[in-house]
UniProtKB/Swiss-Prot annotation:
Pathway: Cofactor biosynthesis; riboflavin biosynthesis; riboflavin from 2-hydroxy-3-oxobutyl phosphate and 5-amino-6-(D-ribitylamino)uracil: step 1/2. It comes from the Archaea. Its EC number is 2.5.1.78. Gene3D superfamilies: Lumazine/riboflavin synthase. GO terms for biological process: riboflavin biosynthetic process. Catalyzes the formation of 6,7-dimethyl-8-ribityllumazine by condensation of 5-amino-6-(D-ribitylamino)uracil with 3,4-dihydroxy-2-butanone 4-phosphate. This is the penultimate step in the biosynthesis of riboflavin. It comes from Methanocorpusculum labreanum (strain ATCC 43576 / DSM 4855 / Z). Disulfide bonds: none annotated. The gene is ribH. The active site is at residue 88. This is 6,7-dimethyl-8-ribityllumazine synthase. The lineage of its organism: Archaea, Methanobacteriati, Methanobacteriota, Stenosarchaea group, Methanomicrobia.
Length: 155
């Protein structure tokens, strides 16, 4: 039986990051976590490029452009959607989630979901480096692992 399991070797990995400016107080912490993870796993600064977009809804388009460019082995998507008093939250969460998944499936490269979808600011803060860790860090580590699984599969 052959088992494919990702490792955290980051040799020659190029990473694109899409970060939403809306809720930048939270997203900047997610980005800091992602960059910390990449640095800890020896991804060179020159191998990371960041594109800022207005909000979470715009993430999938730029993730798709990055994936189509063939410059990156993985794309990390970072944002924070915090529930308000209208149904807008539900629409944004659904479309961002579907959009990011679609880009990954269409492009064949890992497009990591580091978009927080929380009921309140406290939950977002907890997931951006407080009690529950940093989901940006987790997305970056996941990106490295996924790149290595794909390399093992020979695709």
């Amino acid at each position: 039986m052959k088992v494919y399991e990702g490792n955290l070797v980051s040799k020659n990995i190029k990473i694109g990051i899409v970060a939403a400016r809306f809720n930048e107080f939270i997203v900047s912490k997610l980005l800091g976590g992602a960059l910390d993870a990449l640095k800890r796993h020896d991804v060179a600064d020159d191998d990371v490029e960041i594109a800022w977009v207005p909000g979470a809804f715009e993430i999938p388009l730029i993730a798709e452009k990055m994936a189509e460019s063939k410059k990156y082995d993985a794309v990390i998507c970072l944002g924070a959607v915090i529930r308000g008093s209208t149904s807008h939250y539900d629409y944004v969460c659904n479309e961002v989630t579907k959009g990011i998944a679609t880009v990954s499936l269409k492009s064949g490269i890992p497009v990591m979901f580091g978009v927080l979808t929380t009921d309140n600011l406290e939950q977002a803060i907890e997931r951006a480096g407080s009690k529950v860790g940093n989901k940006g860090f987790d997305a970056a580590v996941g990106a490295i692992e996924m790149v290595n699984v794909i390399r093992q599969l020979g695709n």
